[in-house]
Regions:
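C-terminal structural segment of proteins
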Residues: 1-325
Length: 325
């Protein structure tokens, strides 16, 4: 990797002062270090945040809402009984990330701000990879793990953050802090589509870092389900999270978010509308089809997989027998 200056920050103020243009913030480093070793990302300075105590911890409860600071380790989420009981979509998704070793190093902020695992990007061809003759490497090449929504543009990679999915389904907010102070946005608004290979994947301003995630008071039921190649140390192919509120036995409101199908975290409006005003059964859940999907040449399997994953997510959320779906 390229030689770089190392700054071990011990406070938020020190970190913000050190994060000059050309710098990169690092907590667990499970994504950044891999990109640096492969020369995909080559910062002049790395600002280490692991010793910034102001950025780690979980507070609050399901009645008032829970705040998770960005430097909190994934293992700490799994140790939280409040999250396990009331925000099971987040707890379940976190439990599936990597291995115990990775979960003990990886941070919430790092997971949310990681970069795509598209092999063309990781091989140095950029987020919007084009060959010398102008062909799109992902559209015309091996796209088995790419998006099936928003495929008319050049950003065809699948969004990489699994934790973003339950957080969006749960209606979580993200607080960013930088030289101009703090601002709070929806978790979904952390992300944007790059317009060039040098453009950012994130809406964070220069010098800003993610400070915390805020979950609203827990209402209704929530859950997650994912499909993957193998059961351990693998990324999901498709994963979904749902948050449902009820009026009696019928769904009065629904939020369904999906991983692995678009360059942004995907809100499945079709799935949400399909179950509103109805009781969740295997039949009503299956009606939440992959409406609007436009798969590429090698990933049409994700359309069928998405239907099953959403069905099983909704069944898990309400406690139905998902294995019959």
């Amino acid at each position: 990797m390229k030689a770089f200056e190392y700054v071990g920050a011990t406070s938020v103020d020190q970190a913000l002062k050190a994060l000059t243009p050309g710098s990169a913030a690092m907590a667990g480093g499970t994504d950044l270090m891999n990109r640096m070793k492969d020369y995909v990302t080559s910062p002049d300075r790395v600002v280490y945040l692991n010793d910034v105590k102001e950025l780690a911890g979980i507070s609050g409860d399901s009645t008032s809402g829970v705040t998770i600071l960005a430097g909190t380790r994934l293992a700490d989420i799994l140790a939280s009984e409040s999250i396990k009981k009331s925000y099971s979509a987040l707890w379940q998704t976190t439990s599936e990330v990597g291995t115990p070793q990775i979960r003990n190093m990886a941070s919430v902020g790092g997971n949310l701000m990681q970069h795509p695992r598209c092999w063309y990007y990781r091989s140095g061809f950029g987020l919007l990879p084009k060959s010398a003759d102008g062909k799109h490497m992902l559209r015309d090449g091996d796209n088995r793990y790419a998006s099936i929504f928003m495929t008319d543009g050049d950003a065809l990679y699948a969004h990489p953050s699994s934790l973003a999915i339950p957080l969006i389904a749960l209606g979580a907010k993200a607080t960013l802090i930088g030289p101009e102070g703090e601002r709070t946005i929806d978790v979904a608004d952390l992300y944007k589509i790059p317009v060039s290979n040098t453009d950012s994947l994130f809406t964070a301003k220069s010098g800003e870092i993610l400070k915390s995630i805020s979950l609203p008071a827990a209402t209704g039921k929530n859950g997650s389900f994912e499909a993957r190649h193998k059961q351990a140390h693998d990324w999901p192919l498709v994963m979904a999270s749902a948050s449902l509120t009820f009026s009696g036995d019928t769904v009065s409101d629904a939020r369904v978010a999906v991983y692995g199908v678009a360059p942004l975290p995907w809100r499945s409006k079709a799935a949400e509308e399909a179950i509103k005003g109805k009781a969740v059964t295997v039949e009503t859940a299956r009606a939440a089809a992959a409406e609007g999907a436009k798969p590429l040449t090698m990933n049409a399997y994700k359309v069928a997989m998405l239907k099953t994953v959403i069905t099983r997510t909704l069944c898990v959320t309400v406690g139905n027998r998902y294995w019959e779906a």
